[in-house]
């Protein structure tokens, strides 16, 4: 443990900058009283995300020491009691008395006073990530227990707090002069965050990894004493020599790239007072595209001026390259076209950043956009000119997206029930007559046979039927080009008229319920899985809003004494057969439907389509990350993941069977 607190110049490649750092550098702006009363104003709420935000705040302070060149090692430890310890081997928080508060140490002022810290002045930190002095005092106010230890000039200074109040005076003991840094151990207050909330090891580990990616010169030592998921180590040294390029490589499938190169760079400009790092790649489909940005190691999920600069640079670069090779199709390119399938990670370090809101989710600093744009544009021009084959391939990729977008826009501009101009709907669609979407339903069926029965069984005013031609495409393992050119997907998107992905507009959705109606057998379940995958990856908002349903057509028809009964699956058939045999000794005849097309329209209406007699399964989307993993495992490109998923589910099913048999 003591090694962590040691400072060794040989371990540190970056130059250490020694400056005078004392109590006079700590500025005081305000008090701490409002924090416990209104925590949401400072950390965005009192839920699990807000609680984990406390870890980010303490870690940001440690990262600031590293970014400023004063620390090379950071440690994060999650203890058995669910408390967290974060340590950095930096200079240590000043412990001498503060000029404005002669009876208080600077350490106590920082921990008990809102808006106190050294980050308001450029003399100590040129770039800072914590909440400008708010961070550690807010963590203290919202912690049941907090203990801070400072190693400085051969002494260990320690002090304990609870709910923002001091429990002990500053205590000092003699230690080795080699030890330096700050250690903070804290436990969130259950009165604020609920007793059932505990830190999630996976979440904290990912926070630590993201910080290590952002500053390649820092090593973060991770240790967890509580039980962790199989994909999270108990102990690890987190260090990424290639920074954001390493991060992006770990998040994408390298065999699914439009061009086999990641466009990345790492630039520091003393003249412009900016440090900039980025990594961008383009994938063959947009199902896993993402954009993450940071300013001074703080996540900016709502983007801001740094993202605007990057986007403008890439747009300008591609248009300039297109003009150079004489391709006129780039004239209509937009930022949305270029970043439709792009995954991006961006990090900037600047002096005195300006953010929107207390929790810093959007960067609004003036001048940053142009700086970022100019730097990245120069490097992107060189990237494109260095390999014209790859550059042309990338250009053709984004132009195809642009043309598809413009075609979809033209289709969306056509009103669904406009009396003077009819929508160019798919030829196989049997639309309903009601002009508004309220109370209407679209049944998606496979093939003309099932479509014919469904069209005869429907309520023409409120129910539409769309038979899909050919094989339904698995969008999880298909390129964007295949998705765009697939006839079944084109028909479906045109019929719904709501657009997909970033172009989704719920007000344009033409039906209130979208009902997947497939055969009740294994083949039907496979088709339903493909369609659900399509909706999850292309129209997740539609699923979240509760528009997607699965029909439950019968697989079996049971007849006894001229009475007809229906069963959806084998288990229901067995139960129904047993029940009928108990009530009557009459013979039971069992028939199995080969598909929806074999059913008479009256039967289909009675069992599957009549709103008062049918059963529907509503498809919901709650744990998005888990669903995303399942879709990737089961429907993605890698067969080994699919095999493992099926194998694990088979084991679960076998256990259920064994339990039922009581073996």
Curated annotation (Swiss-Prot):
Highest taxon above the source species: Bacteria
Catalytic activity from the UniProt record: ATP-dependent breakage, passage and rejoining of double-stranded DNA
Classification via Gene3D superfamilies: 3.30.230.10, 3.40.50.670, Histidine kinase-like ATPase, C-terminal domain
GO molecular function: ATP binding; DNA binding; DNA topoisomerase type II (double strand cut, ATP-hydrolyzing) activity; metal ion binding
Toprim domain sequence ranges: 440-554
Record: residues binding Mg(2+) 1: 446, 519
Gene Ontology CC annotations of this record: chromosome
Residues of the site described as Interaction with DNA: 471, 474, 526, 642
Enzyme class: isomerase
Binding residue positions for ATP: 21, 61, 88, 130-136, 360
EC code(s) of this entry: 5.6.2.2
Cofactor note: Binds two Mg(2+) per subunit. The magnesium ions form salt bridges with both the protein and the DNA. Can also accept other divalent metal cations, such as Mn(2+) or Ca(2+).
Binding residues for Mg(2+) 2: 519, 521
Cofactor(s) named in the record: Mg(2+); Mn(2+); Ca(2+)
Role noted for this protein: Topoisomerase IV is essential for chromosome segregation. It relaxes supercoiled DNA. Performs the decatenation events required during the replication of a circular DNA molecule.
Subunit organization: Heterotetramer composed of ParC and ParE.
Family: Belongs to the type II topoisomerase family. ParE type 1 subfamily.
Protein name: DNA topoisomerase 4 subunit B
Protein source organism: Rickettsia typhi (strain ATCC VR-144 / Wilmington)
């Amino acid at each position: 443990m003591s090694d962590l607190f040691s400072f060794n110049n040989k371990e540190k490649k970056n130059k250490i900058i020694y400056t005078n750092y004392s109590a006079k550098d700590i500025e005081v702006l305000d008090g701490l009283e409002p924090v416990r009363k209104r925590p949401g104003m400072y950390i965005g709420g009192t839920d699990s995300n807000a609680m984990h935000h406390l870890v980010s705040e303490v870690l940001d302070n440690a990262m600031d020491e590293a970014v400023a060149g004063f620390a090379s090692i950071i440690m994060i430890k999650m203890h058995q009691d669910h408390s967290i310890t974060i340590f950095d081997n930096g200079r240590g928080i000043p412990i001498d008395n503060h000029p404005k508060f002669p009876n208080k140490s600077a350490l106590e002022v920082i921990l008990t006073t809102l808006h106190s810290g050294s980050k308001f002045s450029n003399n100590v930190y040129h770039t800072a990530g914590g909440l400008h002095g708010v961070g550690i005092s807010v963590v203290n106010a919202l912690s049941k227990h907090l203990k801070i230890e400072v190693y400085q000039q051969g002494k260990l200074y320690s002090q304990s707090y609870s709910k923002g109040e001091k429990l002990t005076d500053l205590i000092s003991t003699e230690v080795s002069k080699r030890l330096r840094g700050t250690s903070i151990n804290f436990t969130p207050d259950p009165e604020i965050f609920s007793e059932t909330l505990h830190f999630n090891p996976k979440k904290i580990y990912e926070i630590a990894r993201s910080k290590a990616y952002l500053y390649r010169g820092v090593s973060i030592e991770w240790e967890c004493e509580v039980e962790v998921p199989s994909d999270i180590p108990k102990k690890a040294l987190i260090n990424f020599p290639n920074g954001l390029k390493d991060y992006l490589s770990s998040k994408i499938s390298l065999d699914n790239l439009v061009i086999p190169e990641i466009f990345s760079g790492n630039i520091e400009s003393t003249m412009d007072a900016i440090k900039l790092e980025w990594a961008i790649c383009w994938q063959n489909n947009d199902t896993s595209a993402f954009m993450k940005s940071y300013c001074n190691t703080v996540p900016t999920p709502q983007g801001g001026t740094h993202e605007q600069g990057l986007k403008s640079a890439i747009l300008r670069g591609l248009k300039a390259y297109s003009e150079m090779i004489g391709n006129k199709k780039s004239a209509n390119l937009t930022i949305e076209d270029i970043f439709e399938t792009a995954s991006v990670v961006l990090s900037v370090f600047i002096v005195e950043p300006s953010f929107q809101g207390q929790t810093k989710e959007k960067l609004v600093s003036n001048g940053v956009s142009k700086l970022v744009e100019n730097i990245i544009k120069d490097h992107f021009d060189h990237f494109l000119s260095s390999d014209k084959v790859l550059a042309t391939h990338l250009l053709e990729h984004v132009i195809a997206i642009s043309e598809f977008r413009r075609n979809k826009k033209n289709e969306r501009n056509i009103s669904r029930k406009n009396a003077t101009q009819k929508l160019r709907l798919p030829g196989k669609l049997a639309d309903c007559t009601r002009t508004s979407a309220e109370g209407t339903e679209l049944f998606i069926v496979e093939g003309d046979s099932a479509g014919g029965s469904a069209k005869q069984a429907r309520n023409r005013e409120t129910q539409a039927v769309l038979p899909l031609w050919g094989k339904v495409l698995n969008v999880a393992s298909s390129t964007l080009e295949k998705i765009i050119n697939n006839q079944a997907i084109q028909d479906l998107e045109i019929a719904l008229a709501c657009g997909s992905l970033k172009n989704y507009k719920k007000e344009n959705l033409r039906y209130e319920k979208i009902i997947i109606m497939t055969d009740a057998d294994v083949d039907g379940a496979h088709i339903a899985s493909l369609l659900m995958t399509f909706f999850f990856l292309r129209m997740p908002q539609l699923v979240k809003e509760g528009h997607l349903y699965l029909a439950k057509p019968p697989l079996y028809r049971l007849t006894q004494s001229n009475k007809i009964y229906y069963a959806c699956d084998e288990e229901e058939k067995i139960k129904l057969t047993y029940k009928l045999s108990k009530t009557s000794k009459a013979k039971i005849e069992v028939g199995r439907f080969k598909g929806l097309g074999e059913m008479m329209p009256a039967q289909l209406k009675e069992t599957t389509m009549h709103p008062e007699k049918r059963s529907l399964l509503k498809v919901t989307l709650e744990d998005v990350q888990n669903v995303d993993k399942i879709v990737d495992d089961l429907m993605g490109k890698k067969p080994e993941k699919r095999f493992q998923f099926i194998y694990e589910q088979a084991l679960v099913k076998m256990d259920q069977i064994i339990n039922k048999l009581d073996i």
